[in-house]
UniProtKB/Swiss-Prot annotation:
Subcellular location: Nucleus, Nucleolus
Keywords, alphabetical: Coiled coil, Nucleus, Ribosome biogenesis, rRNA processing
Classification of source organism: Eukaryota, Fungi, Dikarya, Ascomycota, Saccharomycotina
InterPro entries on file: Cgr1-like (IPR005579)
Protein family: Belongs to the CGR1 family.
GO terms, biological process: rRNA processing
Tagged with keyword rRNA processing: yes
GO cellular component: nucleolus
A Pfam family it matches: Cgr1
Coiled-coil residue spans: 48-104
Name of the protein in question: rRNA-processing protein CGR1
Length: 121
């Protein structure tokens, strides 16, 4: 109890010293939670910083969207190229098959002519 009363006296006594000399103000520890002021107006630097951050985020979003769009476009172009190459290859095979078929038909005709000529003798 005596300790408690001594502390109360120290708290009450603090004021201007008897000598009149001014001492440094006794500071309390910084408590960040108490310092936060809601709805306070931002300084010009904080506004600039916030705007810069928003611009940067916006640019990143735009860049990501552009990359996504470009990737989709590249995929479509690649599919188109593959389709055209496949079609060209198929046409080449068809031309070869037609040519081979014609050669085979010619061979058969020659054989038939030969056989016919042999039969007529």
């Amino acid at each position: 109890m005596s300790d408690n009363t001594a502390e109360q006296q120290d708290i009450q006594i603090k004021g201007k010293p008897v000598s009149g000399r001014t001492w440094k103000v006794e500071k309390e520890p910084l408590r960040a939670k108490n310092r936060v002021v809601k709805n306070k107006k931002l300084t010009s630097w904080e506004l600039k910083k916030q705007k810069r951050l928003e611009d940067q985020q916006f640019k990143e979003k735009v860049r990501a969207l552009k990359e996504e769009k470009k990737a989709e476009k590249d995929a479509v172009i690649q599919a188109l190229k593959e389709r055209r190459a496949k079609k060209e290859e198929q046409e080449r095979y068809d031309r070869l098959a037609a040519k081979m078929h014609a050669k085979k038909v010619d061979r058969l005709r020659r054989r038939e002519k030969r056989n016919k000529a042999l039969k007529e003798r």
